[in-house]
Amino acid sequence: MTATFLLEIGTEELPADFVRQALDQLQQRVSRDLREARLGHGAVSVFGTPRRLVVSVADLEDRQPDLQEDRKGPPVAQAFKDGIPGPAAIGFAKRCGVDPSALEQRDTPKGPCVFATVLTPGQACVELLQGLIPQWIDALQGRRFMRWGTGAQRFSRPIRWLLAL
């Protein structure tokens, strides 16, 4: 299922040149991070006024797709002794989070190696966004930044509210 995501950063009066810079940075960063997080989405649009920075993401998927990857391990000669998994195979299986009996042998240009198929379930979009939104705000760069309150947060002007729908 897809939905439109909206992030609004409400601030005190921002300098005009910072609004333009921040919107460009937000558009690039949001697009890149959603792609890296394997979240399908449509167009990323940005809007700004002197007191608001807004990002809108059309058709954002509600969760990541599951990721299935094949991981290459040690050569078969090191991993198995007489068909029984040795320390190398057991350690590789443990590192991949699979049972040693699930390991497969495949031929590679460097000889037969052990492979593990690892399935990583996709996370919910909401969980991913909880980590991404603060990163997007912290990554914004500009000429003059200030701190306010007791936190370490830096921004062009004090942030008064965040809206994420």
Regions found by a protein language model. Name each.
Residues 1-165:
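Long, basic N-terminal domains or extensions that often function
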